[in-house]
Regions:
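Short His-Asn-centered micro-motif
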Residues: 2-4, 32-33, 171, 188-190, ...
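A short acidic, glycine-rich active-site loop
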Residues: 24-28, 166-167
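Central helical "cap/lid" subdomain
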Residues: 9, 20-25, 189-215
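A conserved beta-strand/loop capping segment in the N-terminal third of enzymes
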Residues: 13-23, 30-86, 150-155
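Glycine-rich FAD pyrophosphate-binding loop
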Residues: 1-18
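Active-site/ligand-binding neighborhood in enzyme catalytic cores
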Residues: 56-61, 70-205
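PAPS/PAP-binding and catalytic site of the sulfotransferase fold
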Residues: 37-41, 176-180, 209
């Protein structure tokens, strides 16, 4: 196993900060609906039952994500799927009408695309700012194809994932990685491409997990 970083685990690597396992490269939640997979990883290290339920803050008001009935209640005060669906359809129709008034039939940018999929309110409060920060450009300057669809759940469920099993290894991902690699020859701080010929000669098959366009 070769890693050009000075530690095991790649993007799963955790740092211990005052006894807290901090995901150095962003939060990672393990999730699967396959019981065999779940049983396998739990045979290596015990997982907790963490449920990812994000919350967005827009001008001091909190909204549950992903978009579900809790979100729609917080947004509009609606309490039934029928009310939420009617509100979304109403705003989608308004977005399409604005486009037609401009003489266009298809979304010209991400803003128009998002509003025809989910309506103005959710777009303005929960999509626009995040997207513009992520891309460093205004949504009106981004192509429509970036957003193909926006999942909407007409149930009161804040669970981000649909998978049956999810969690984080107790003790952090480092424990999982170290046990998976127990007995394996590892080289850290080693650039695969700087020693490619030598390393490829050591194995019948290479599994590359870096940036695909580097290989």
């Amino acid at each position: 196993m070769v890693d050009r970083r000075p530690h095991l685990g790649g993007n799963l690597y955790c740092e211990d900060v005052e006894g807290i396992h901090v995901h150095k490269y962003g939060a990672h939640i393990f999730h699967t609906s396959d019981k065999k997979v779940w049983d396998f990883v739990n045979s290596i290290v015990e997982f907790n039952r963490y449920t990812n339920s994000p919350v967005a803050n827009y001008k001091g008001k909190l909204y549950n994500l992903p978009f579900n009935m809790n979100t729609f209640y917080q947004m509009w005060g609606v309490t039934t799927p029928a009310e939420a669906k009617a509100k979304i359809e109403e705003q989608k129709a308004e977005a399409i009408a604005r486009m037609k008034a401009d003489g266009v039939s298809e979304p010209r940018n991400l803003e128009e695309q998002a509003q025809t999929l989910i309506g103005k309110d959710i777009y303005e409060k929960l999509i626009k700012g995040y997207t513009e920060k992520q891309w460093g450009r205004k949504c009106t300057e981004l192509p429509a194809f970036i957003i193909k669809r926006l999942p909407v759940r007409l149930v009161f469920d804040n669970n981000y994932f649909n998978d049956k099993y999810q969690g984080i290894p107790i003790g952090g991902y480092n424990v999982l990685i170290e046990r998976l690699l127990d007995g394996a020859d590892t080289r850290l701080g080693c650039d695969f491409f700087a020693h490619r010929e030598e390393l490829e000669a050591l194995a019948d098959k290479v599994v590359f997990t870096g940036a695909i366009d580097e290989y």
